[in-house]
């Protein structure tokens, strides 16, 4: 009868009740919200992007906001975007992590990040509209089946100012080409093979003028974007770099020329520490020269002017193109729609590192992490038993550690924290810290029993001493982990968050409850 009263009193103790409430709340949280996993467990992609030039912290925050909107518009979920910025050098890095995506989706996301999203509409060498003049309405994209089964389109409207400028420069020029660019290589030196140079000056880029002669594409590029096109005729790497430097170019683009030349130019730029970006393009299998040129320039069109803008009102235009399959056509349309809808980035980003983990491999990591956690609990149970030779001590210690894990996971589900391998390592570290503190409590209680001290004040003093040690240890751990939380970006944050969470749950919830449970169990002896 006395034992039943003791159990009832224990269960009604406010410290034990608090533990029970936290456990129930955590189980409910995990059931309703569910756990979310980082890319190293759930699978996904991690990309590190670097701005093309140094930016301020405010500009960097603006880029992150635009990227978030762009990826949300694209339909991506479970996005984490973090930034590192050095105010002295201006060097910045953006870390993008996206869970639960396929390899194809990962490649599309990389393209989205590297697309600055600056739209230009040019007519005969004059830019008459940019992205700020464009309005893209919701879901105004898809397949253009009237053109072909695998053709796509993205519709948009021009502002009145851009429309008026277009009227002035295009009046009476039916059939002339309209060029639309998305992120053209502005202020670059473009060195192309003779056949590509001939293609760029051919009728493929001249439209179908009813009267007059439009400027060739090479001339339009020079006037609109300061892109200088040079025909390759056995120039050396030194000649090309010297030419680009003299013209004040930002980029050198080598198209359909020997790869050895590209390697030589790149090495020369690196050796001289020049602020020039070097890129190399070669035609893909089955790609004709017109499509190759359009890919280099990020050119859509050229479209033919089919109406006299001075005689009619039309503000709705569209980007269009084709792809090998319907699925790829829809993907391309959705990508461009996402870029235009979210707006352009302040500077262009270049992905300097990427890591993809398949969901299958992530599931294997999750299984290993679960096994490691169970192994840690069993190890705790056995070590505590061999130390005290009492199951009534070992089982509560291991159970309390399990309760801590459940509560940590419940809170993680509630705040939608992505669990990754460092986070799980933090949980295991918190278990180790918790066991240390429970041993301190147990030793104090056993010390009181060994000395046959029965007075309540003595027991309270021993508990006060134990919790002083526990709180001091917890404070030290929290301070140390706070530095990781504040000053580091990436996986170390997950370790810091779960460790701090585990320590706080321990000192505020599970440790006081364990002390009451241990006092009751030891009193039975």
Curated annotation (Swiss-Prot):
This is Protein-export membrane protein SecD. The chain crosses the membrane at residues 16-36, 368-388, 395-415, 421-441, 466-486, 488-508. The keyword Transmembrane helix applies. Part of the protein translocation apparatus. Forms a complex with SecF. Disulfide bonds: none annotated. One of its GO terms (biological process) is intracellular protein transmembrane transport. GO terms for cellular component: plasma membrane. InterPro entries: SecD/SecF_arch_bac (IPR022813), SecD_arc (IPR024912), SecD_SecF_C (IPR048634). Keywords: Cell membrane, Membrane, Protein transport, Translocation, Transmembrane, Transmembrane helix, Transport. It is a multi-pass membrane protein. The keyword Acetylation does not apply. Involved in protein export. It is found in: Cell membrane. Belongs to the SecD/SecF family. SecD subfamily. Its main location: membrane.
């Amino acid at each position: 009868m006395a034992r039943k009263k003791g159990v009832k009193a224990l269960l009604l103790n406010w410290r034990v009740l608090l533990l029970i409430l936290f456990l129930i709340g955590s189980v409910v949280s995990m059931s309703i919200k569910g756990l979310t996993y980082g890319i190293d467990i759930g699978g996904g992609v991690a990309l590190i992007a670097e701005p093309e030039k140094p930016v301020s912290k405010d500009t960097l925050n603006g880029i992150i906001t635009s990227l978030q909107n762009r990826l949300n518009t694209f339909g991506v979920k479970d996005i984490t975007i973090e930034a590192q910025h050095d105010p002295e050098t201006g060097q910045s890095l953006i870390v993008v992590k996206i869970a639960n995506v396929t390899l194809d989706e990962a490649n599309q996301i990389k393209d989205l990040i590297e697309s600055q999203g600056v739209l230009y509409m040019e007519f005969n060498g004059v830019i008459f509209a940019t992205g700020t003049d464009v309005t893209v309405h919701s879901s105004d994209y898809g397949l253009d089946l009237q053109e072909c089964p695998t053709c796509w389109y993205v519709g948009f409207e021009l502002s009145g100012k851009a429309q008026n400028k277009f009227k002035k420069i295009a009046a009476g020029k039916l059939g002339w080409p309209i060029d639309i660019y998305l992120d053209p290589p502005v202020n670059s030196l473009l060195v192309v093979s003779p056949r590509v140079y001939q293609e760029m000056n051919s009728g493929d880029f001249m439209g179908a003028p009813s009267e007059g002669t439009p400027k060739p594409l090479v001339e339009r590029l020079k006037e609109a974007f300061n892109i200088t096109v040079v025909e390759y005729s056995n120039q050396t790497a030194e000649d090309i770099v010297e030419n680009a430097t003299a013209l004040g170019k930002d980029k050198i683009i080598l198209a359909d020329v020997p790869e050895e030349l590209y390697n030589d130019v790149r090495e020369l730029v690196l050796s001289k520490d020049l602020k020039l970006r070097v890129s190399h393009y070669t035609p893909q299998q089955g790609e004709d020269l017109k499509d190759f040129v359009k890919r280099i320039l990020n050119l859509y069109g050229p479209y033919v002017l089919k109406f006299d803008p001075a005689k009619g009102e039309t503000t709705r235009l569209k980007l269009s193109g084709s792809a090998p399959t319907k699925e790829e056509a829809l993907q391309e349309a959705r990508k461009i729609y996402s870029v235009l809808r979210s707006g352009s980035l302040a500077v262009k980003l270049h992905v300097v590192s990427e890591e993809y983990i398949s969901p299958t491999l992530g599931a294997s990591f999750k299984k290993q992490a679960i096994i490691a956690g169970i192994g840690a609990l069993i190890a705790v149970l056995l070590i505590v038993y061999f130390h005290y030779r009492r199951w009534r001590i070992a089982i509560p210690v291991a159970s309390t550690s399990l309760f801590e894990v459940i509560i940590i996971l419940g809170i993680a589900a509630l705040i939608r924290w992505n669990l990754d391998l460092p986070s799980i390592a933090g949980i295991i570290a918190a278990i180790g810290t918790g066991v240390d503190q429970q041993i301190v409590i147990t030793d104090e209680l056993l010390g009181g029993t060994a000395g046959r001290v029965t007075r309540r004040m003595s027991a309270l003093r021993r508990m006060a001493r134990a919790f002083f040690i526990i709180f001091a240890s917890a404070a030290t751990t929290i301070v140390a982990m706070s530095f990781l939380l504040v000053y580091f970006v990436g996986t170390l944050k997950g370790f810091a968050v779960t460790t701090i969470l585990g320590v706080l749950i321990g000192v505020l919830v599970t440790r006081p409850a364990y002390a009451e449970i241990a006092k009751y169990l030891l009193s039975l002896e």
